[in-house]
Curated annotation (Swiss-Prot):
Stated family: Belongs to the uroporphyrinogen decarboxylase family.
Residues at the site labelled Transition state stabilizer: D75
EC id: 4.1.1.37
Encoding gene per record: hemE
Any Pfam family the entry gives: URO-D
UniProt keyword annotations, A-Z: Cytoplasm, Decarboxylase, Lyase, Porphyrin biosynthesis
Top EC class for this record: lyase
Subunit structure: Homodimer.
Binding site for substrate: R26, Q27, A28, G29, R30, D75, Y150, S205, H319
Protein's name in the database: Uroporphyrinogen decarboxylase
Keyword Cytoplasm on entry: yes
Length: 343
């Protein structure tokens, strides 16, 4: 299929669609029994690094739910391992040793995709063959700030105080770290596009922990450089910053065609702020999928009503789908969006 034949691609550019496209963040995951069956015999990192299995898992929600896009099964921390930190899952991710000093930063190296992550590129090539034009394939990576949060903290955190301490006490070291991560993110995502990804999403899961002023100073320059470096491929770029409702104008300044919204942001307000030149993606609260199907349909209708038929809307969750969600509710959501918006 040509790019103009995909509702997902058309929505990213604000072009007419036959119906509102929908896909779900973390749509390949633990809520699907077929995914859990694979995970019974394979550890998470091994799954990410085995192209045949990663491709199989990527395709599961396409077949089971009828989503309008596939997203590469991987993890945002994969490129960090190649930079020189050890990556473990216990079961949450742990990075050792944490990056805390100027010497730690200098010891990091910029990723070389074909050498360091050939499995990611082979998974993309395999998926393009297996999808055979059914739906477009989204590649993805972490935003520089979110990757820095994990690298400095060494694990997930509620407040990321080690990262903020570095940011405020050693701004030159912080800037050098962010430059190295941005350089890695650029070559990593460019390699995904060259391998065949038809859209790219940049996940900034922790960008919302900062004030708008700090986001503008410490995050925006690097996210803008990353997105700018991906613009020559002619594919849609989606920028998702969780918790960014108070600074959507700054998020839009980073570039790309689509701003992802979490569920704490009014879609109607977001569209007013962003204007007609920027598409939006979102933004159902993932926990709604734990409810009855009449509740799911009510919330789908509310979000569609907030969008008011404006072009450039991709329906999605406001964050990743929860492992506890019944698969039939996820399938109902996709069907509901399609049914209510079919032209």
């Amino acid at each position: 299929m040509m790019p103009e034949d995909y509702d997902f691609i058309n929505a990213c550019y604000g072009r007419p669609v036959t119906r509102t496209p929908v896909w779900l963040m973390r749509q390949a995951g633990r809520y699907l029994p077929q995914y859990r069956k694979i995970r019974e015999r394979v550890k998470f990192l091994e799954l990410c690094k085995t192209p045949e299995l990663a491709a199989e898992v990527t395709l599961q929600p396409v077949d089971a739910l009828g989503v309008d896009a596939a997203i590469l099964f991987s993890d945002i921390l994969i490129p960090i391992e190649a930079m020189g930190q050890n990556l473990f899952y216990r079961p949450a991710p742990v990075l050792e040793p944490p990056v805390r000093t100027a010497a730690d930063v200098e010891a990091l190296r910029v990723l070389q995709p074909e050498q360091d992550v050939p499995f990611v590129l082979e998974t993309i090539r395999l998926l393009r063959r297996e999808l055979d034009g059914r739906v477009p394939l989204i590649g993805f990576g972490g935003a520089p700030f979110t990757l820095a949060c994990y690298m400095v903290e060494g694990a997930g955190s509620r407040h990321f105080l080690a990262l903020k301490r570095l940011m405020y006490q050693a701004p030159e070291t912080y800037a050098r770290l962010m430059d190295k991560i941005t350089d890695t993110s650029i070559v990593y995502l460019r390699a995904q596009a060259e391998a065949g990804a038809q859209a790219l999403q940049v996940f900034d899961s922790w960008g919302g922990i900062l004030s708008p002023a700090d986001y503008q100073r410490y995050v925006l320059p690097y996210s803008r450089r990353l997105l700018s470096a991906l613009g020559d491929f002619g594919i849609p770029l989606i920028h998702f910053v969780k918790g960014a409702g108070a600074m959507l104008d700054l998020v839009a300044m980073a570039g790309g065609q689509v701003v992802g919204l979490d569920w704490c942001t009014s879609l109607n307000r977001a569209r007013d702020i962003l204007g007609n030149g920027m598409a939006v993606q979102g933004n159902l609260d993932p926990s709604v999928l734990l409810g009855a199907q009449d509740i799911i349909e009510r919330e789908v209708r509310r979000i569609l009503d907030e969008n008011a038929g404006r072009p450039g809307h991709i329906f999605n969750l406001g964050h990743g789908i929860l492992p506890e969600v019944p698969p039939e509710n996820a399938a109902f959501l996709v069907d509901c969006v399609h049914r209510l918006t079919q032209s």
